Regions:
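Active-site SXXK
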Residues: 1-16, 114-122, 197
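Glycine-rich, histidine-containing beta strand-loop boundary motifs that form or position
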Residues: 2, 17-19, 44, 134
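Generic hydrophobic/packing signal
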Residues: 3-8, 23, 41-48
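Short, glycine/proline-biased beta-turn/loop segments that scaffold the active-site neighborhood
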Residues: 15-29, 142
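Short, surface-exposed loop or secondary-structure junction motifs
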Residues: 30-200
Length: 200
């Protein structure tokens, strides 16, 4: 949200412009009222919450390997495929199920909306990726040295939290941050510490 507001302050985007102006893959064709940047910022785009499109699955479909191709948080092909999949899914959802209300009418938390916002930042922020923009324009200026969007780094950081989930009725710990990582970073890839969050 802060990064979007930085772009708005610089006159690069308009909060009341339709998302399709910045992300043409999102056609908005099944809605009478256009979803705007402001709607997504306030989780009022009218979308129902959806399961995550996982970064690992998208990277695998593209034949990418993190050891060879680098952290997927900085990979343009993953971001391009991710935004295409998210945009198609939201367009399909509104055609099949309608909306959870007209854009701006109701709050409905949807990670896909913030995923699209992060892609606006990737496209218009002047940096190679959303993660690069966040580091240069938000995290470094605030001195947030233990905050990032990387997927590989936390699995190698002994201070990173262990993720737990129930598998076959048993709680199991994992340090695989791809397991539930949304393909577009703005939809939930940020990792931080309480100390860093105080700086924000």
């Amino acid at each position: 949200a802060l990064s979007i507001m930085q772009l708005e302050e610089k006159g690069m985007i308009d909060l009341d412009a339709p998302i399709s102006q910045y992300i043409p893959e999102f056609t908005n064709k099944n809605q009478s009222k256009k979803v705007t940047v402001r709607h997504l910022l306030s989780h009022a785009g009218g979308f129902f919450p959806l399961p995550r499109i996982l970064v690992g699955n998208v990277a695998e479909s593209l034949g990418l390997d993190e050891e060879k191709d680098g952290d997927f948080a900085y990979n343009d092909a993953v971001a391009q495929e991710g935004v295409k999949l998210v945009a198609e899914r939201l367009d399909a959802q509104t055609k099949e199920n309608g909306l959870n209300g007209q854009p701006g009418e109701y709050l409905s938390y949807c990670n896909d909306g913030f995923g699209l916002l992060s892609d606006i930042i990737r496209r218009y922020g002047g940096e190679p990726s959303y993660a690069d923009y966040l580091v240069k324009h938000v995290l470094k200026p605030l001195g947030m040295e233990r905050s990032f969007c990387d997927f590989v780094r936390p699995s190698k950081d002994e201070n990173a939290a262990t993720l737990y989930k129930k598998v076959d009725g048993v709680m199991r710990g994992s340090r695989d941050y791809h397991d539930n990582a949304f393909v577009l970073n703005g939809g939930g890839a940020m990792k931080s510490t309480l100390h860093d969050l105080k700086k924000y």
